[in-house]
Amino acid sequence: MNLHEYQAKQLFAEYGLPVSTGYAVDTPEAAVEAAKKIGGNKWVVKAQVHAGGRGKAGGVKLVDSYEEVAAFTQNWLGKNLVTYQTDANGQPVAKILVESCTDIANELYLGAVVDRSTRRVVFMASTEGGVEIEKVAEETPELIHKAIIDPLVGAQPYQARELAFKLGLNPTQIKQFTKVFLGLSQMFHDYDFALLEINPLVITDEGNLHCLDGKIGIDSNAVYRQKKMQEFHDPSQEDEREAHAAKWELNYVALDGNVGCMVNGAGLAMGTMDIVNLHGGKPANFLDVGGGATKERVAEAFKIILSDSNVKAVLVNIFGGIVRCDMIAEGIIGAVEQVGVNVPVVVRLEGTNAEKGREVLANSGLDIIAATSLKDAAEQVVKAAEGK
């Protein structure tokens, strides 16, 4: 679960970190009032969506009049912002953040993630702020400095100082950086973050550190115990199909291909996507129905896949270990009858009750293509998606 920038900065402020004075608004009139309340003659207005690249897409602007504040707000509210991190439809803008203007002398990067290789929270800092950190990591990895947090003792001031030295900060800035570092680490622990980024963490003209942006991702497995984070949840920023799938305990991720995939098990699902790609197809989704799939969940999974208008064919690939193939077959039949499928369906069943499952499908009277192997299934579904 992700947070909006204004929500992240609200948390930063609660932990005593330096952020700009700002207000999240949902009308042009409220935006003008926010600018008046902030004061000054320049403001930054930012469209609030769960995606990076807003500036290049026109979703962030420096303005110097109340008319511009109102015009920007009027222009973006209710519209979708498309960036390099969104799909072609973009994400809806329901809030605009109006902030005071900050003079920038230098831009840094500070972030933290849960690193699976070390099984620790790892902080990363770089002098290359304001750009995509992935690009920095790929092209100049030596410019990214790391601090690994021991979960038994937590973040320590000396770790902050080590990073600050590598960033070339002066003594006053080192003290400020230490406060920011320790505050972020505590916040990361308190709210079960999975990702945290301040990009950029700027040095102002006065030489002070300032959190100019904020990106936070919450561990979805921990949201149930984070009541405050639940209040920050914005369902409008989620893919409708993904949100619907989550209610049925289905692991679904929308992609941009035309071959719908329904598989049991994450590993098999990824392997299925790979083999579809290998044979010239493009998966429209990742969907894992899980080992404890029921007939109802399978039917719902089928409906979710078919709700994507880009899907031209569906591949059902089931290995019956815990789940029974005949039950999956009944779910497929139920879904096809309910939804009214008008695209080819290729089914590959192996494992527990596979023969019975194939028999159920064969006797259903439905136009379902039976595959004899995984390779055969991939070849058949790619051909079907191409209309061959």
UniProtKB/Swiss-Prot annotation:
The keyword Transmembrane helix does not apply. Its cofactor is Mg(2+). Belongs to the succinate/malate CoA ligase beta subunit family. GO terms for cellular component: cytosol; succinate-CoA ligase complex. This is Succinate--CoA ligase [ADP-forming] subunit beta. Succinyl-CoA synthetase functions in the citric acid cycle (TCA), coupling the hydrolysis of succinyl-CoA to the synthesis of either ATP or GTP and thus represents the only step of substrate-level phosphorylation in the TCA. The beta subunit provides nucleotide specificity of the enzyme and binds the substrate succinate, while the binding sites for coenzyme A and phosphate are found in the alpha subunit. Mg(2+) binds at N199, D213. It comes from Marinomonas sp. (strain MWYL1). The keyword Heme does not apply. InterPro entries: ATP-grasp, ATP-grasp_succ-CoA_synth-type, ATP_grasp_subdomain_1, Succ-CoA_synthase_bsu_CS, SUCC_ACL_C, Succ_CoA_ligase-like_bsu, Succinyl-CoA_synth-like. Pathway: Carbohydrate metabolism; tricarboxylic acid cycle; succinate from succinyl-CoA (ligase route): step 1/1. ATP binds at K46, G53, R54, G55, E99, T102, E107. Heterotetramer of two alpha and two beta subunits. One of its GO terms (biological process) is succinyl-CoA metabolic process. It comes from the Bacteria. GO terms for molecular function: ATP binding; magnesium ion binding; succinate-CoA ligase (ADP-forming) activity; succinate-CoA ligase (GDP-forming) activity. The gene is sucC. Binds 1 Mg(2+) ion per subunit. Gene3D superfamilies: ATP-grasp fold, A domain (3.30.1490.20), ATP-grasp fold, B domain (3.30.470.20), Succinyl-CoA synthetase domains (3.40.50.261). PANTHER family: SUCCINATE--COA LIGASE [GDP-FORMING] SUBUNIT BETA, MITOCHONDRIAL (PTHR11815:SF10), SUCCINYL-COA SYNTHETASE BETA CHAIN (PTHR11815).
